[in-house]
Amino acid sequence: RMLEWTRKRQKSGAAIDTAVKNLPLVRTVIVPENIEHAEYKHYLFVEPEYLKEGWTRDRIVEEISALGVPCFQGSCSEVYLEKAFDGTDWRPKNRLTNAKELGETSLMFLVHPTLTEAEISKTCMVIKSVVQSAQVS
């Protein structure tokens, strides 16, 4: 069952990547051929230099969500900022540059295996439409 679910998630993630492949505003994750991504969630990353004036990553999330497609602000890229790390030696003295950037630019989408092809198709259409609206020409 897990193999089937993974294949469905991978197919959904690939569909999202295909929908945005010619849109410079978002960067996809390039997975090396010798690695198999489980696609528990699917991420895209906003390239801020391509944002139209008045647009932000958070506005993209809001617009996609308003059109009925779940969209979130990504991962726990800087978990060390959580209260649990207060007063410990485990928090870095300076924020980690790459972790900060990933946290500030990530878009996270659901690709769980219970989603239908119609739902993934809608997801792709909505993402593409909103990204096109948010992207400089």
Model features per residue range: what roles?
Residues R1-S137:
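PLP-dependent aminotransferase class I/II
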